[in-house]
Amino acid sequence: MHIAIAGNIGSGKTTLTRLLAEHYGWAPKYEDVDVNPYLSDFYNDMQRWSFNLQIYFLNKRFQDVVDILNAAENVIQDRTIYEDARIFAPNLHSMGLMSTRDFENYKSLFDLMISLVKPPDLLIYLRSSIPNLVHQIHKRGRAYESGIRIDYLEGLNDRYEEWIQGYKDGKKLIINVDDLKFEENPEDFQKVLELIENATK
């Protein structure tokens, strides 16, 4: 079983990945943001580093999917390969932060990679409002995220909504997280578990 969690920056992907891995005894596959050599530079100069960052993420995400396909255990994944190509790169391109030449090159590489792997058994999308995202980002206090622009988050949210509505590659579950505090509230986490169990029947 491969379950993947998608959602904007600060939506709770990593937290839910950890909680589900602990609850079900699954292997977690986390997004490795702390060792990313481009992330801090990107937030300081998005236009200069956008292509480098997106290629780095695409490479790591493809390797993750290959590892998951070869794994003999159930895996819960924090962030999907789709989000890089369907959300982040197009958003950067539309904002003028990635050139058309780089974007077309990136899309071509993604199309090749995606033809070689299969989608997750269940895709969970964590839907969140911008105020909730901003609150969560400030709460966790990652230094490199302190300069995230609101218009950048808004653009991502719009693209997430468009993408998830059109997602037809496999089963999907949309969870509205603005009023769910699944880390602090066991009842909220139980609600999430029930939604997942119904979606995987």
Where are these predicted regions, by residue range?
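Conserved lysine of the Walker
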Residues: 13
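Hydrophobic anchor at the beta1->P-loop junction of P-loop NTPases
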Residues: 5
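Conserved substrate/cofactor phosphate-moiety recognition/catalytic segment
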Residues: 22-60
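Glycine-rich phosphate-binding loop used to anchor ATP phosphates in small-molecule kinases
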Residues: 49, 53-118
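A glycine- and Lys/Arg-enriched "phosphate-lid" helix/loop adjacent to the NTP-binding pocket
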Residues: 87-161
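NTP-dependent small-molecule kinase module
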Residues: 134-201
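P-loop (Walker A) phosphate-binding loop of NTP-binding proteins
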Residues: 8
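Post-Walker A alpha-helix
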Residues: 16-17
